[in-house]
């Protein structure tokens, strides 16, 4: 490996995951593809994470260990800190609590070199619990009907307008290899000021710059925790607000998105709002949705009606029908 010009920069952003760090770092260091630098970031953990990271200070792959004195409160600011430190053509944000197969990097690097102007390469993932045991179900939208090919290439802007519009189908950064030169351009993007939906915005903006490759092999293991930040975000309404802001960005980017498709998406947002337990918070979010996107209760009714219309109208748009797939 040329430490000055590695092919891949592996960024491990950590906060209070000392108990998972050694297994995670070994899963990276044991990769069959070894042309990478390792950037270790800690966001002022209160456990012994800094001590664990320090054990790897003299490892040949480790180029940076940065321990914050004060917590940033933003995983996405840590992402960008690592991206700006990175020297590789490609970046892998290997979340500190996840795991991977030994040929994750080898497979992804092969795929991104096979196609033109790739911005993002995503593998299939499985869920694991806090103890590392496999959970039921799959993490990927294609799991119920796997393609009969090993990988597929998609034009980035089309993927953003169809697949990423409905929801963030790239659910875990640990399962992605992406182009650093495109990510650096997002150094002042709005995703940095988000707490919950920043990854959705990041992947969307990456795909506006280059193309997408989906790899249909389970090479990533996405750890699920009993207490999740996303649940807190939904109950407080903050995540839903960020989702609404994300739709504003996407609809401004693609002004030709049809009204029916928009209304279905707004109906999805309204359904999330109805699940918020606090009635006053529901009213606040409904007003925010209306002000930002013109979304209203009738969009939710259309969303439910659409579920029945899809059976008698095979041409009608639905989330699954609108997605690009092979």
What are the residue ranges of the model-derived segments?
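Membrane-interface aromatic/basic loop that binds lipid-linked glycans or pyrophosphate carriers
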Residues: 1, 252, 269-326
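Short loop->beta transition adjacent to catalytic acidic/histidine clusters or analogous donor-positioning motifs
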Residues: 5-8, 29-40, 48, 60-64
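Short, well-formed alpha-helical segments that are part of the catalytic scaffolds
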Residues: 17-30
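A conserved acidic beta->alpha catalytic loop
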Residues: 27, 42-51, 70-72, 95
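Glycine-rich, basic loop-to-helix element that forms the pyrophosphate-binding segment
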Residues: 68-86, 99, 107
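Short aromatic/hydrophobic "clamp" motif used to bind/position activated sugar donors
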Residues: 91
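Conserved donor NDP-sugar-binding/catalytic core segment of glycosyltransferases
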Residues: 103-143
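Conserved nucleotide-sugar donor-binding catalytic segment
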Residues: 142-239, 243
């Amino acid at each position: 490996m040329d430490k000055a010009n590695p092919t891949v920069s592996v960024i491990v952003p950590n906060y209070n995951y000392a108990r998972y760090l050694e297994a995670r770092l070994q899963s990276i260091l044991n990769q069959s593809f070894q042309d990478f630098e390792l950037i270790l970031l800690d966001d002022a953990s209160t456990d012994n994470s800094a001590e664990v990271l320090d054990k790897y200070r003299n490892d040949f792959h480790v180029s940076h260990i940065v321990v914050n004195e004060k917590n940033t409160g933003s995983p996405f600011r840590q992402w960008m800190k690592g991206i700006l430190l990175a020297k590789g053509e490609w970046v892998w944000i290997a979340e500190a609590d996840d795991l991977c197969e030994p040929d994750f990097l080898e497979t992804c690097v092969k795929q991104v070199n096979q196609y033109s102007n790739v911005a993002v390469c995503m593998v299939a993932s499985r869920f694991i619990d806090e103890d590392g045991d496999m959970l039921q179900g799959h993490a990927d939208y294609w799991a119920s009907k796997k393609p009969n090919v090993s990988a597929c290439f998609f034009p980035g802007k089309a993927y953003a307008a169809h697949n990423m519009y409905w929801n963030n189908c790239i659910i875990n950064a640990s399962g992605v290899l992406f182009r650093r030169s495109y990510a650096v351009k997002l150094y002042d993007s709005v995703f940095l000021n988000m707490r919950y939906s920043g990854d959705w915005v990041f992947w969307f903006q990456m795909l506006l710059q280059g193309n997408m490759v989906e790899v249909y092999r389970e090479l990533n293991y996405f750890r699920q925790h009993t207490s999740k930040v996303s649940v807190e975000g939904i109950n407080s309404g903050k995540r839903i607000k960020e989702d609404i802001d994300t739709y504003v960005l996407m609809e401004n980017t693609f002004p030709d998105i049809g009204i029916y498709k928009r209304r279905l998406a707004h109906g999805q947002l309204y359904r999330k709002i109805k699940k918020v337990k606090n009635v006053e918070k529901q009213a606040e979010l409904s007003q925010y949705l209306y002000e930002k996107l013109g979304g209203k209760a009738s969009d939710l009714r259309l969303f439910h009606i659409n579920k029945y219309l899809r059976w008698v109208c095979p041409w009608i748009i639905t989330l699954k029908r609108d997605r690009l797939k092979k």
